């Protein structure tokens, strides 16, 4: 159920999309969710012989916290504070204010936002008709409603639901925010990279329905992030390891890659790197890939069962020692996959892998948790790292030219096709919608 105030200045009231039978305690709901998830995961673990069941307590805890709006309010305020303290993001990202005095575990009251959903590409990119030095309704001093006009009044029935605030689209309603998809997507990747590598507080449900885009009076885009129920916290040691992992993957530093994943109990660095990058990793020993290369289609069909067994083994190798495996990686992977899908949906306007890797390397220089001597060493490595990333730019611009000439898709389409092909060779069909909210 979702209810909204219909007057500017009064916030929206939301109790989310959870079905809560009248009189049923919230603890019962959490118990039911946990029991159902345990049962399904146990069946999967037994049928496919993959150690999923040990992950149930952590996943169930995260999902149950989504039903607690006080937890969501805490996450929302913490994220707003972190963004306000980061000069590279504070003018590009906005977190709606929460009214604590009007909120509880079952209901959260938050600031009303007028914006365009991420999936409405036309509304984001069409020309702006809202006036000079004006922004989206309610954005940084822009009035929520235009000055009163003497024309025909609004439909009174519609006004009871919510006032129309489409004056910025122009008389024929064909205008838009006049923004660049590249600027929008850059802000998104910057935001979630900072969450992973700088702050260790990661929003794990960044699908298009949870992201609004507004136009500031300056003409620049502003990303509004909502729905802060599903977060994970990364301790400083794990956060530094994860940043080093990304640097190692992008520079083919297989020694560092192997060292890090070994401490996590992972037995197959290549497959793990591919799953993290969302593209086949070409820098390791390629043992898994070589086992599949050189086979004809008929040979692959004959070996279908063996390849499925190899796929199961690869997953077991990724999970490795369940006592060492960082369970946060489940939801970090979800975030990465959804952000990749968002970039793909918008036509791959940015080199997501390069931006993410740059934040990882930069975090090892800027993190307050690291000693000064290590920061200085990482600074020199960061300069070298930026040079190495030039090859990633070459591939990105190759795909952009190909896309412009209508000879193929964008960078994310190529990555998606490579991953689909790699998985198919292993007897697995990837469901591209599995992480998209």
Cite the ranges covered by each PLM segment:
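Conserved ATP-binding subdomain of kinase catalytic cores across diverse folds
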Residues: 1-166
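Short, charged/polar micro-motifs that form catalytic or ligand-binding hotspots
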Residues: 22-26, 62, 66, 199, ...
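Helix-rich C-lobe and terminal helical cap/extension of kinase-like folds
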Residues: 57-59, 104, 113-115, 120-187, ...
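Residue-level signature of catalytic and energy-coupling elements of molecular machines
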Residues: 72, 109, 207, 227, ...
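Long, hydrophobic, amphipathic alpha-helical segments used as structural scaffolds
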Residues: 87, 200, 346-350
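Conserved helicase/translocase P-loop NTPase motor core
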Residues: 183-199
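Conserved catalytic-loop position in the HRD/HxD motif
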Residues: 200, 205-207
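Hydrophobic residue at the +6 position relative to the catalytic HRD Asp in the kinase catalytic loop
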Residues: 209-213
